[in-house]
């Protein structure tokens, strides 16, 4: 996942 990608954390903004």
Curated annotation (Swiss-Prot):
Q: Signal peptide position in this chain?
A: none
Q: Which GO terms describe its cellular component?
A: mitochondrion; ribonucleoprotein complex; ribosome
Is Acyltransferase tagged as a keyword?
Answer: no
Q: Does the keyword Chloroplast apply?
A: no
For this UniProt record, the keywords arranged alphabetically read as follows: Mitochondrion, Ribonucleoprotein, Ribosomal protein
Where in or outside the cell it occurs: the entry states: Mitochondrion
**Function, in words:** Putative component of the large subunit of mitochondrial ribosome.
Q: What is this protein called?
A: Putative large ribosomal subunit protein YmL1
């Amino acid at each position: 996942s990608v954390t903004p």
